[in-house]
Each structure stands twice: as structure tokens, then as C-alpha cells.
Amino acid sequence: MTVSKIPIWLDCDPGHDDAIAILLGCFHPAFNLLGISTCFGNAPPENTDYNARSLLTAMGKAQAIPVYKGAQRPWKREPHYAPDIHGISGLDGTSLLPKPTFEARTDKTYIEAIEEAILANNGEISFVSTGALTTLATVFRCKPYLKKSVKYISIMGGGLHGLGNCNPNLSAEFNVWIDPDAANYIFRDPDVKDKCIVVPLNLTHKAIATYKVNEMIYNEKNNSKLRELFLELFQFFAHTYKDMQGFESGPPIHDPVALMPLLEFYGWDPSSAVGFRYKRMDISCIDDVFNENSGKIIIEKEYPNDSDVGTIIGLDLNIQYFWDQIFEALNRADKMSTIG
């Protein structure tokens, strides 16, 4: 096991599953969460900003993690949100979220803040994206010299072989679909694509918050208000996923899956424990707004797994390991929570 923590920047659009990514970033012992940027996506950007600050307040991390407002809209098209899945606020389903006790930082732009974090952790920092890729693509478009200084870019997005939840043919995943132009900017960049890790729906659909998972989160012995908050978020998420996408056993908790490969690749835990299986591919997506398959992932080329070329596309994971990391982080968060 490595001694040093893994420096990460999280760009997210909270979002029920983003909430768990924030929990892991804050409280998993492996991660040093340097900052959060919030983008449009699951809800309008003013909501995702508020939600991130509310979650950090609830977890006792107010002002400990700087929050910046990231990309506010897609590069070329009109924004789309997901109230049918996440509710109007982006975090519907609980009344336990507190009013944030701090504001988003305005001392610098999100581009400057991310630049500063990358340069301070040159060659070691990883960027985790659990929403649209607009924030990161904008950073690299404005400051392309930063590309060489990021170790990994871990992305929750896309679906292989036409698996999706958006567009008329349901062949695109939401995060890619809402800004495929920004996604292609990352996927097609020869300086970036080989350090990208993509966890697609094909993998995240295995990370189901079942009834048994809910019992581990909140039970007679572990019944804090913070745990109740996460239980209520999961229960709301379960209802919307059952109603809108037919998930009977519970909702898929997509976003925190993007953090798991980093635990293996930085040497925090062995591959035998993490169980991350992947293929290396060059990918792109259909970015024509008028195409019925807009946002669909296209596999351009496949490489041998032992190659250092091609985007790392996740296929499988030790799901028990995944939940164990979340339970450990929640145990730690319990001790700092401001809501009981």
C-alpha cells in the first residue's frame, strides 16, 4: 500500500450518485480531495452548486473543500437536465440537507483553480468527472499545456454497444449526451485519450443499491441523521429508476465507480481486491444534434490490454469491494457530520 494520498479534483453535478462520489472523495483514506467544481447536468448549475455545498456542510466539510462553479452550459447546444431521475432540485427525496454555511469560491475562476491544483500536484493529480465533460474540456482548450501534468482522467460516462438512457433510441448515456462536443474533445485528443479511464453504464449498472445495501447504510445500530439522509436519497433514487428505467432491485450508483480504478492504479489496493477489468480502446461519440443516436459511443479501435495506448474502458469490478469503500467512508463521515 502506498503511504501518500491520491490527489484528485472532482467535477460533478449533484445528483444522488454524485453525493456518494463526494462522500468518498472527502472521507476515503486514500483520497486527497483538492477541490470540487460543479457543472450543469442532473439539475441547473445553480442547483448543483447549492447541492454540493449542502452535502459538504452536512458532512462537516464546510470550507474544508473549496467549491467552484464550473461549466454552466454545453459548448454548442441547449442544456438538458434530469428532473425525472433526480427531481427538480437535483437532490430530491430528503428534508435533512442543511442550508450551506459557506459560499462557492469567487477568488478565481474554475479554470484558474483547476490549473493551480494541477500545477501544485504536477504529474500526480487525477481529474474525476461524474457529469458532462464540459468543465475539463474547457480547461484543456484554454490551457492545453496542463494536459501533460494530469496522471489520469477518470470519467463516469458513455455506454458500450448502444447501451444508454438518452436520445430517441436510448443509445446514449446522459453525461455524454448533454455535451457530446466536449466529450469528443477529450476522447479524440491524442495527448489525453490514453490517460482516460471511462466507467460506462455497462459497468455502473452492476453497482446496485439493493435493499441489503440500504440496511448497511441505515440500521438500528447505525442510525445517524447523516445515514438517514443517504438512505432517503437512495430510496428516492430507487423509485425514479424503477418508474423511469425499470430497475427492480434498486438504483445503479454510477458516479462513485469512477473513483475505484484509481485505488488500483495508484497502488492503494491490489488488483485482486479491486477487481477492475477493462479493455483499451479509442472511442468517440456521435455529436450531430440532429442524429437520433446523438451521444452514442463509437468504438474506433481496440488495443491489447497490456498496451499503454487507448482509453481504459471499465468492464467489471468487485462490487463488494466497491460497497465496502462506501461503508468505510460513511463510518468516518458519521464522526464529523453536523446533522447528527
From Swiss-Prot:
InterPro entries: I/U_nuclsd_hydro_CS, Inosine/uridine_hydrolase_dom, IUNH, Ribo_hydro-like. The keyword Oxidoreductase does not apply. It comes from the Eukaryota. The keyword Aminoacyl-tRNA synthetase does not apply. GO terms for molecular function: nicotinamide riboside hydrolase activity; nicotinic acid riboside hydrolase activity; purine nucleosidase activity; ribosylpyrimidine nucleosidase activity; uridine nucleosidase activity. PANTHER family: INOSINE-URIDINE PREFERRING NUCLEOSIDE HYDROLASE, URIDINE NUCLEOSIDASE. Belongs to the IUNH family. This is Uridine nucleosidase. It comes from Saccharomyces cerevisiae (strain ATCC 204508 / S288c). The gene is URH1.
